[in-house]
Amino acid sequence: MTDDKKKILIDYNAHTINAMRNVVKEVLKSIQNNTLPENHHFYITFDTNFKNVDIPSSLKNKHPEEMTIVIENSFWDLIIKDSFFSITLSFSNIKSKLIIPYNSLLVFSDPYANFHLKFPKLEYNKEIITRIDKNKENIINIKDFKKDK
């Protein structure tokens, strides 16, 4: 007898997505000295509304939902951390620092290598707000229990 409704206890999808994000992190580490291998260049699309994304307001106004950056010849101060990377790029001849969490990534592409990764758009911000709103119903103010003295 086979059970058609198996309970899968290992979230392979989440592990795969984490591995894909780790590929991006390792690739960026490999160019941290501001040197890309010949002909390689990266397109990175990210969710500009994602928690801890930090970009100048002028860029946020131009890209209210998503933004694609190109890492090619001119980039500075690439710093790789466990949960994000930061990079300085030039936009209209103005250098701007961007902080991009790996969880905000939507696309990573190296057209020269014909390598492309597409990530699901995470809805953490909406989930947290919904959870907080639901929990507000269960919050009791301590002032309601204090006796006046």
Located regions from the model:
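Short acidic, Gly/Pro-enriched loop/turn segments at secondary-structure junctions
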Residues: 111-123
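N-terminal, Lys/Arg- and Ser/Thr-rich interaction peptides
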Residues: 1-7, 18
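Short hydrophobic short-linear motifs embedded
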Residues: 8, 119, 125-146
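Phosphoinositide-dependent membrane-docking surfaces
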Residues: 99-109
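N-terminal recruitment modules of adaptor/scaffold proteins
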Residues: 13-99
